[in-house]
Amino acid sequence: MTTDEEIIIRLYQEMYSSMINKDRAELERIHDDSFVLFHITGMKQSKNEYISAIMDGTLNYYSAVHGDMEVAVNGDTARLTGKSKVTAAVFGGGKQTWRLQLDFELIRKNGEWYFTFAKASTY
């Protein structure tokens, strides 16, 4: 049996694969419609804005090597802090590798976990 923690970690890994592969359907599936992302700069994006930025090349992801991941589940909500070395070119900048930390909130609906909130920082 797979634990909620394992499912959430796998979801985090799937998210990065979907960002790299520009897989709109998977990105739509794993992010709740209420999803909001706060970038390192403080810029806020809704689910639709975020996915559109990946699809149109505003946010380009090339690889991600995952490090520490901490998950805390509380009933049908959870928090995940994931640390990954991410190679990306974003907002017209050059390709570089970032030590990116994402702090997530998730919700479980009908037995499935979805990202509802993310805040990016570096570590």
Positions of predicted regions on the chain:
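A beta-strand edge to alpha-helix "cap/lid" segment located at domain peripheries
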Residues: 2, 6-29, 34-123
